[in-house]
Design a protein with these regions (language model features):
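Active-site catalytic microenvironments for nucleophilic, acid-base chemistry
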Residues: 29, 36, 76, 81, ...
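A structural signal for the hydrophobic beta-strands that form the central parallel beta-sheet
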Residues: 37-39, 75, 245
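Mid-domain catalytic core of redox enzymes
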Residues: 15, 41-186, 190-201, 236, ...
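A short coil-to-beta-strand element that immediately follows conserved catalytic motifs
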Residues: 38, 106, 203-215, 278-279
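Conserved beta-strand segments of alpha/beta enzyme cores
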Residues: 36, 67, 207-210, 242
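Active-site/ligand-binding neighborhood in enzyme catalytic cores
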Residues: 1-46, 69
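C-terminal lid/capping helical subdomain adjacent to the catalytic/cofactor pocket in oxidative enzymes
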Residues: 212-217, 223-295
Length: 295
């Protein structure tokens, strides 16, 4: 059939309480089967020996350190951080490729508003007849805003008073440490509201009833700098027989959530069948089509 960009399709499957619900459910099932999830800690070291990963060194928020041994290691951490966590046995050229991988960072400002001035001019029925889009790309060069999410349309269960209020997410693309990233939350929210007023999406700052800001580091793996040499890095990492790299940051690929999860599905399939090749894992969504196309 004719291919339609995901940005234009009218229906898709989405968790009732958002993507986090999926991971909360997975975590609960892991623990129910006897698995342990170590929270509030970060990986500070990756131990390797004879072509295998042997253990992870971790540090908790309270400064506690421990080593966690394992037979199989599935990594979704940024490739840059994964290689940086390995010891001095990593060749200098491989380490340089990993260190040079670029990213774009991301700030989202959530605003609860009384209403939007955007009208529903379609035949699509929505609660309270609000504009039906889940996301809107902003082309106005006079604002920094890049995209607007309308959470009411993702799932009405995300909004407490869905019949009279609208939760929107304003997305800004930036770099960690730049002037926008370093804005106080108060100034960031004020800027976001001012841009909406300037665009005519809301009428006045008093229309904003509540707000919340989130910063996301390394949200977008970028395809420049040392990315042109990433095949050398992939080949090196594939040399560790019990290490699998999955996900957007784990593969340094700008994939949608479904493709990112598919890399993990392929990994599990390989582990269960004894397949040693990583080709199917790295080849998810590499047909070079635009990443938001769907048959």
């Amino acid at each position: 059939g004719r291919k339609v960009e995901t940005s234009l399709i009218e229906e898709f499957i989405y968790p009732k309480y958002g993507p986090g619900q999926l991971w909360e459910t997975a975590a609960a099932e892991i623990e129910a089967m006897g698995g342990q999830i170590v929270k509030n800690c970060k990986v500070t070291g990756v131990r390797t020996e004879n072509g295998k990963v042997t253990a992870l060194e971790t540090e908790g928020t309270n400064g506690s350190k421990q080593a966690i041994e394992g037979d199989i290691f599935i990594s979704s951490m940024p490739l840059k951080d994964l290689v940086a966590s390995m010891d001095e046995t990593v060749p200098k050229d491989i380490r340089a490729i990993a260190e040079g991988l670029p990213y774009r960072d991301f700030v989202t400002v959530g605003l609860l508003v009384d209403h939007l001035n955007l009208k529903n001019l379609t035949k699509i029925r929505t609660l309270n007849n609000i504009v039906p889009d889940c996301w809107i790309y902003v082309q106005d060069t006079g604002v920094k805003l890049g995209r607007i999410q309308i959470f009411n349309n993702w799932s009405p269960y995300l909004v407490e008073d869905v019949d009279s209020k609208v939760w929107i997410g304003l997305e800004y693309f930036c770099n960690e440490g730049d002037s926008f990233w370093n804005l106080s939350e108060e100034k960031c929210v004020r800027l976001a509201a001012e841009e909406l007023i300037r665009m005519g999406v809301i009428n006045r700052k008093e229309d904003v009833l509540d707000s919340h800001r989130e910063k996301v580091k390394k949200a977008y793996p970028a395809y420049f700098d040392t990315y042109s040499q990433i095949d050398q890095l992939i080949s090196y990492l594939n040399g560790f027989e019990n290490l699998y790299c999955v996900g957007r940051n784990g593969q340094h690929r700008y994939n949608n959530m479904d493709h990112s999860m598919a890399t993990a599905f392929e990994t599990v399939k390989n582990i269960l069948t004894g397949e040693k090749s990583r080709e199917n894992i790295w080849n998810v969504n590499t047909e070079k089509e635009y990443h938001e196309e769907k048959a």
